[in-house]
């Protein structure tokens, strides 16, 4: 299962509204292994500090797509899984 083009476009639109300068898909959707219960894993970079406001973007994407979303910032990536995540990345918005 993949994200449809219109779903990716909705994510990009939400990123723009929430000061996200980079967004990439990783995990089961990026590997085309997602099923009906899979969440959407997104690696993001904010253009300015957000505090806990980053949750607004996650909730907005969840509401729009009807699926749980995990937003992870580049700075919060564990060194133990960083390479695993980076090899799956599908950039949706912005530049690495």
Model region roles, listed by residue range:
Residues 41-44:
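Short beta-strand->loop micro-motif that forms the acidic, two-metal-ion catalytic signature
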């Amino acid at each position: 299962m993949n994200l449809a083009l219109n779903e990716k476009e909705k994510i990009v639109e939400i990123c723009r509204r929430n000061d996200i300068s980079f967004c990439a898909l990783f995990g089961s959707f990026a590997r085309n292994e997602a099923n009906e219960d899979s969440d959407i894993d997104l690696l993001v970079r904010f253009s300015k500090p957000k505090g806990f406001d980053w949750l607004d973007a996650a909730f907005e994407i969840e509401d729009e797509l009807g699926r749980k979303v995990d937003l992870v910032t580049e700075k919060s990536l564990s060194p133990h899984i960083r390479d695993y995540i980076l090899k799956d990345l599908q950039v949706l918005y912005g530049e690495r």
